[in-house]
Amino acid sequence: MARETGFTQLHFERGAIGDCAGKNGAADLLIALHACDTATDDALHHGIRAGASLILAAPCCHQEIRAQLTPPPVLREVLRHGILAEREAELVTDGIRALLLEIHGYKASVFEFISSEHTGKNLMIAAHKRTQPHDPAPLRERLRELLAFYGLRSQRLAQLLGE
């Protein structure tokens, strides 16, 4: 595909993210489409570690946070319904991912990239590397508050980044 499109420096890897994550060092662009559950976190971690100037991820499956989600009292009546708890876990997971990207020097945004009539998994996390330094301390405090609010003990990307 790279040859056919004239992008001779474009390289595709097939396999587990961890198996190819250290091969080339730096990366200009990281794209992860529908990497299941914590595979999205592995991909984001690789992009951050490689210093990618642009990271695009379309997450899929959010079991890690769903299993831990402990609704705060104010949300218990709403999140006692399985489908609502599942959707909340998806939003919280992707919100944490965007926040972690911001903590680690990226400007992140989350948006719908394809109509929900085609797929329910239609969120895109986009992040570009900041050119100016920033103070991550206030963002780290927000992360701690968010994790505590939902009773979350761990999140894969946070662990990989040492947060």
PLM feature spans:
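Class I S-adenosyl-L-methionine
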Residues: 1-163
